[in-house]
Design a protein with these regions (language model features):
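Conserved alpha-helical scaffold segments that buttress catalytic/binding sites
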Residues: 2-285
Length: 285
């Protein structure tokens, strides 16, 4: 049973039964390699969302016109990545069994692996569209294979070649970029190639998991993240890319890597809230 959440993201007050989309938070950042704090992202987004309008002038849609249930944050073991991932996967499976769309709030990017495991069980031909500043394709980070620096490599272990589509990547080891060139559909530095990739996936009607690491945004727009990288995209570029991806058969998604305390101005949290609002409205049918 999924209990109601006390503090919800604005406009996400539907009951579980009537909702088509279910938010669930994974406040986990135990493998953070630079600046910690992403565990506080989901709660900050909910709290600060009430400074946001439910209406989007970009899409002429309103959160009050769609059905979203916010199930709150999971209680996760910070001392064990394996236990945390297991708990996240169980929640995602519960949502999927009810034929609802699971939308995960991180947390660091490792949490995506748990969601992908759950979604891939239901959709064995799953593809991933990945927006990020970092390739996240290391085989291990300081000996750990379960790390936010390795999450897409672990997803590749699960899905295989040609089923991960990466955009905006502008940081990583040389070996990661070489691995991507051989094993993923790799589009570094920008969203160039996104429309073509989405068109091909849409024609095949394959299921897509959509993961957004908010550090794909330029740190001038979004400094409140664990590993900021100069040279990112603007908010409007990200919004247009989200709307492009939403045209395809998206069956699960996440937004991750807001570390709110790293931006005392609150701008990063406000930006993350707006990204989530636009994502919800784009994927709602």
């Amino acid at each position: 049973m999924i209990l109601p959440n006390i503090e919800t993201f604005i406009g996400c007050e539907s009951s579980f039964e009537e909702a088509s989309i279910v938010l669930y938070g994974a406040p986990f950042d135990s493998t953070t390699s630079f600046r910690p704090g992403a565990r506080f992202g989901p709660a900050a987004m909910r709290h600060e969302s009430f400074g946001l309008e439910t209406y989007s002038p970009y899409q002429d849609r309103d959160l009050m016109d769609i059905s979203v249930f916010d199930s709150g944050d999971l209680e996760l073991c910070f001392g064990s990545s394996e236990m945390a991932l297991s708990d996240i996967q169980k929640r995602a499976e519960e949502i999927l069994k009810s034929d609802k769309f699971p939308l995960l709030l991180g947390g660091e990017h490792l949490v995506t692996l748990a969601a992908v495991r759950a979604v891939a069980e239901k959709y064995p031909d799953l593809h991933i569209i990945h927006f990020d500043a970092h390739a996240d394709l290391r085989d291990d980070y300081l000996g750990a294979r379960l790390s936010h620096a390795c999450v897409l490599r672990r997803c590749h272990d699960l899905l295989g070649d040609g089923r991960i589509h990466q955009f905006c990547i502008r940081s990583g080891e040389r070996e990661e970029f070489r691995f991507a060139a051989q094993h993923t559909d790799f589009h570094p530095l920008s969203f160039n190639g996104l429309e073509e990739a989405v068109r091909e996936l849409k024609e095949k009607n394959v299921p897509i998991y959509f993961t957004i690491d908010l550090d794909c945004l330029d740190p001038a727009v979004f400094p409140g993240t664990g590993t900021p990288e100069a040279g990112g995209v603007t908010f409007l570029e990200l919004l247009e890319a989200i709307r492009t991806v939403a045209q395809a058969n998206v069956v699960g998604a996440d937004v991750n890597e807001l570390a709110p305390m790293l931006d005392a101005s609150g701008v990063s949290t406000a930006t993350a809230c707006k990204v989530l609002r636009e994502l919800l409205l784009a994927i709602a049918k």
